[in-house]
């Protein structure tokens, strides 16, 4: 029997505010344990939370970027559960009146656009961190109270690849709008996967399993692939899927049982009496909408329409904010040939950076270097082949292409008279080949071009060489 996976993601995004969600403690990754805490985030009796306005602004910004409807009224609620790293005995979250609902993200899976609907986006505070060492457990409350957005998708994803693409697109949007660095390694973006299987063609959902706290895009894909295989194996044998929470073991590539899945009523949600309902005016929402930068999809569309890039090239460039910024800086230096600039970035620079493990923001090849290189080729000062040599040298030394061309004497010979003399000399030295060419062996054109290039150490302008050869071999 063929099964179809039904996947929804719950993504927690840590907002890049300077201070926590309900107090003035600073947010500092890697600080000494329990140094950025106060009576509010420690849950001391009598301490009162106050909402961070910047966190609210960032959450509204994210909601609008994800095409959500932002509600003029939302309410903070207490989510009650007991954990050593939850000092108040409850988490401030939102329940039946979230900040925003009904959004979507479009992703491209196998060249087909799929719309993944977003059920809701709500604000909440993070818990602290429990570190287990031997027979001891240590609690660090520096993270407690950090502002989070929980972004819950509808179960519209149908493959492990689709889930990964959705997550990557979500991270990209968060970075573009500047509300989060969304670095999974630092825990700034955390993902829980809800997955069930159903027979293909059926509408009814199967029993849902949740996989908690997966901390990389690759592991999200691997965890889903394994879970699809595990559930399909059970169903084919006539077994039943248990509704539960599982964890993913990165070493074995398998999921394992964590606990039985809670229902919402287990958390006994109720409105937080210490926080007044959040009322947002339409004017404030519009003000934030106007402050949104150009988003990845809009940018890609502009690259295709205005700069005449292919859809593929545009998507590769906008898939990373720093990459798009690099491209735009290069085009601002030399705007005559954006297609060639895109080609050099995608086909040469990205591969080299990946090889060396360098981020594009730290690239030794700067945007102005790529612009200058393309300009040198367009003007006929160097050939594309020499351009690759120059690029390698720029990457090694950080020198400008012009400097390298001058230092190494790589400037292309574009003097027609000079090239004509060399072509005539080559033809005079190979009379037999000339006769064969004139008798119909057109393949010898490559031989003549090669001889001219050899004589000029690859510096002759290939277009001129071809033009003069065709004239003289008529």
Curated annotation (Swiss-Prot):
The keyword ATP-binding applies. Keywords: ATP-binding, Ligase, Nucleotide-binding, Protein biosynthesis. One of its GO terms (molecular function) is glutaminyl-tRNA synthase (glutamine-hydrolyzing) activity. InterPro entries: Asn/Gln-tRNA_amidoTrfase_suB/E, Asn/Gln-tRNA_Trfase_suB/E_cat, Asn/Gln_amidotransferase, Asn/Gln_tRNA_amidoTrase-B-like, GatB, GatB_C_1, GatB_Yqey_C_2, Gln-tRNA_amidoTrfase_suB_CS. GO terms for biological process: glutaminyl-tRNAGln biosynthesis via transamidation; translation. Its EC number is 6.3.5.-. It holds the Pfam family GatB_Yqey. Signal peptide: none annotated. It catalyses: L-glutamyl-tRNA(Gln) + L-glutamine + ATP + H2O = L-glutaminyl-tRNA(Gln) + L-glutamate + ADP + phosphate + H(+); L-aspartyl-tRNA(Asn) + L-glutamine + ATP + H2O = L-asparaginyl-tRNA(Asn) + L-glutamate + ADP + phosphate + 2 H(+). SMART domains: GatB_Yqey. Heterotrimer of A, B and C subunits. Belongs to the GatB/GatE family. GatB subfamily. Allows the formation of correctly charged Asn-tRNA(Asn) or Gln-tRNA(Gln) through the transamidation of misacylated Asp-tRNA(Asn) or Glu-tRNA(Gln) in organisms which lack either or both of asparaginyl-tRNA or glutaminyl-tRNA synthetases. The reaction takes place in the presence of glutamine and ATP through an activated phospho-Asp-tRNA(Asn) or phospho-Glu-tRNA(Gln). This is Aspartyl/glutamyl-tRNA(Asn/Gln) amidotransferase subunit B. It comes from Persephonella marina (strain DSM 14350 / EX-H1).
